[in-house]
Amino acid sequence: MYYEIATMTLPFSTAAQAAGHVQAFCSAPEAGGELLGCWFTDIGTLNQMLVLRGFPDVARLQAERQRTQDGGNAFGCGSIYQSLTLDSYRAFPWMRPVRPTAESGLQGPVYEIRTYGIKPDGVQPTIDLW
């Protein structure tokens, strides 16, 4: 499974408006990924929205990334957001899909999102340690 975290910096008090646009963009017939979650920061860097999408393969992730970047209206929020970053991740082989289900154990409205870097040539040793 492949994942993308989009981080948008928004002007104060535009989060609800942006969330509606994100929902519409990600549920459009031409959308190629699955919207897994949308969060707003209230600790750390404020006025950011994080959008988590999942993809079954890298080709669909790349196609959806292209759709997101084309036209200057990413997530339907082109007139709202001040900055946008798109980060892609591939799940480790032992990971269950990241989506709120009984199987994954994910539930509730509050999540802590962390990212970690891995040294060059460190992916396989990390997998082996797990």
Residue spans for each PLM region:
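Glycine-rich beta-strand-turn "strand-cap" elements at beta-sheet edges
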Residues: 9, 27, 34-50, 72-109
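Short, well-ordered beta-strand segments in beta-rich or mixed alpha/beta enzyme
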Residues: 2-9, 37-67, 108-117
